[in-house]
Amino acid sequence: GVVQECRRRRYGTVIVPFPAAELTEALAQPLHRSGIALWVHEKCAHTAPGARVLVCTALSGGDIENRLSACCRAFGADRIVLDLQRLRMDFPLPCPTGEGIPLTDEQLAALQTGRQIFFSRELGARYFTYRRGGETRFVLLDDGDTLHRKIALGERLGIHRGLLTLPECADILRDLTG
């Protein structure tokens, strides 16, 4: 099973970054008894009371400080792990679903060339707009500075853990680790 495989490989943590309530509920007790940490998607926090809770910092609406503060109240800052997903999304305006199209490095570079880029304190991300086919588009993006700001905000709120993924953050690791 999972516990035996974690022991064999000397893993200290199991991360379930997607909503999977049945899975996290089934893993919670065996992992806890074995001294192996469990990190779960915030929608599954109720299924694993001793687990750390992954809270995504990539927002397309709302206010990051309000969101993280609400999560601290709901779960406790000591349980939270910032899921520092690197945002690179292209949205139509208006965008009632809040769902954008992920951009590759090459697509983002082509779109942002020659454009003025702004910082949104509320979203904790950079953005710019452009027009295509008579439609206004909105691009949200994270870089080393924006992720560093999100980490600093988390620290101010008492959140001392974060998760970065590779390869999406490989080019900005130096910006984040100093």
Predicted segments with their positions:
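Short, surface-exposed beta-strand/loop "edge" segments at domain boundaries and coil↔beta transitions
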Residues: 48, 136-138, 172
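Substrate-binding surface in catalytic domains of secreted glycosidases
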Residues: 19-111
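Aromatic-rich peripheral "rim/lid" segments of glycoside hydrolase catalytic domains that contact
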Residues: 167-178
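Glycan-binding loop/region signatures in secreted carbohydrate-active enzymes
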Residues: 79-149
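Catalytic domains of carbohydrate-active enzymes, especially glycoside hydrolases
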Residues: 1-19, 52, 149-165
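Extracellular/periplasmic catalytic domains that process cell-envelope and extracellular macromolecules
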Residues: 46-47, 75, 131-133, 155-156
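Short, loop-centered acidic/histidine patches that primarily coordinate divalent metals
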Residues: 144, 165-167
